[in-house]
């Protein structure tokens, strides 16, 4: 059977950047576990804040965390109370000074993670999986997507045999490296067990910037 490579991992270094923008030699494993703990804490505390991407940067005794969210007001809280509480918890967790930057996602319907999260929540609310997928596809295409593909797998409608069923609209060129394809995988906890939700969104082409060479006229 043909297998698909991870669309984001394939494009890192071409049109996508790394989520963790740091490098270490001897402390690499410590920093990696620290990064995982930071991400887990943020995802737990901000489960309802539509956080799509968490980026980390490091300096000496300092960690810079950038949160991409569709609900910045919920992350910041009244007079910054929520973000201050989160910063204090991260400081305690890492033992370092943590800076938090918040970036608003202008079009959440073009973000694969948020679209997948929305479908998963609808499945948990017992909305039909076909309807949930088709509504998400319509919203993404209206928001300006060039193409979108969704797939829900598991015991659909409580069937004894698990299967996968998906829908697509437009084009999703997975082999084109310059194609800006966002991909996400989510889980929905239903009464019949877990359902997997996959979303691919094609947002158009991105041409890699040509790096100028010194002395080039």
Curated annotation (Swiss-Prot):
Domain KH type-2: 38-106
Cell membrane listed as a keyword: no
GO biological process: translation
Listed GO CC annotations: cytosolic small ribosomal subunit
Pfam families: KH_2, Ribosomal_S3_C
PROSITE patterns: KH_TYPE_2 (PS50823), RIBOSOMAL_S3 (PS00548)
Subunit structure: Part of the 30S ribosomal subunit. Forms a tight complex with proteins S10 and S14.
Physiological role: Binds the lower part of the 30S subunit head. Binds mRNA in the 70S ribosome, positioning it for translation.
Protein name: Small ribosomal subunit protein uS3
